[in-house]
């Protein structure tokens, strides 16, 4: 189930209950609605953590890049609600970078977990190069960017996937919300507004 402890009995996309049993049989749950079960370990990141920690829920890393560096294909990196300024590279890994909104069933965490420009301004989130093609970013917001090109998200020569993201309140002469160059990025259930 998506999150049984809080009463979310929708099935995950790769649940063994899908297409099983006899048609017409009620099993007491809803259709698929929340994505696949994460197959790899889950790494946590919190700005109050430390990169010498093990990346667990109680002992998170301080930086996203540290979590990426220790991850392998299929892993998930979960960000605690906070503002993130970090430049990252996914190093050709097929990983998911997400907020804890799905884990805890609190959709507001998408707004509370966001990338913003650093103290000197600029874009909120930049990915450059094909080493970022296999990444999935979901349940995160990008806001407050002020720059010439790509206030919110800048994707250059890479094509990652964005799911359930909010890109808002960014300013740029070109691509206020999103600036793509050499990219075939995929955006699903994305809100792009007030840019």
Regions found by a protein language model. Name each.
Residues 1, 11, 17-19, 45, ...:
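Bulky hydrophobic/aromatic "packing anchor" residues in well-ordered structure
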Residues 1-6, 34-66, 70:
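Right-handed parallel beta-helix/beta-solenoid
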Residues 19, 153, 162-165, 178, ...:
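Hydrophobic strand positions within the blades of repeat-based beta-sheet folds
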Residues 7, 73-96, 100-105:
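N-terminal extracellular ligand-recognition/capping segment immediately after the signal peptide
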Residues 1-35, 122, 129:
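C-terminal accessory segments
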Residues 94-146:
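Right-handed parallel beta-helix/beta-spiral solenoid domain characteristic of secreted/periplasmic
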Residues 98-99, 111-112, 133-144, 159-171, ...:
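Right-handed parallel beta-helix
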């Amino acid at each position: 189930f998506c999150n049984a402890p809080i009463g979310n009995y929708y099935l995950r996309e790769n649940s063994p209950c899908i297409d099983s049993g006899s048609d017409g049989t009620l099993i007491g749950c809803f259709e698929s609605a929340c994505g696949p079960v994460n197959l790899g370990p889950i790494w946590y990141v919190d700005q109050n953590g430390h990169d010498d920690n093990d990346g667990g829920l109680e002992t998170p890393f301080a930086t996203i890049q540290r979590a990426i560096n220790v991850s392998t294909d299929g892993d998930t990196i979960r960000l605690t609600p906070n503002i993130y300024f970090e430049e990252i590279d996914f190093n050709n890994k097929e990983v998911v970078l997400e907020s804890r909104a799905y884990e805890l069933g609190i959709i507001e965490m998408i707004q509370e977990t966001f990338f913003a420009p650093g103290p000197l301004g600029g874009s909120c989130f930049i990915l450059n190069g094909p080493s970022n093609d296999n990444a999935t970013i979901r349940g995160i917001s990008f806001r407050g960017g002020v720059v010439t090109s790509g206030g919110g998200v800048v994707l250059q020569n890479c094509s990652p996937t964005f799911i359930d993201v909010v890109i808002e309140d960014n300013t740029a002469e070109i691509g206020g919300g999103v600036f793509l160059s050499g990219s075939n990025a995929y955006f699903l259930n994305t809100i792009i507004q007030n840019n």
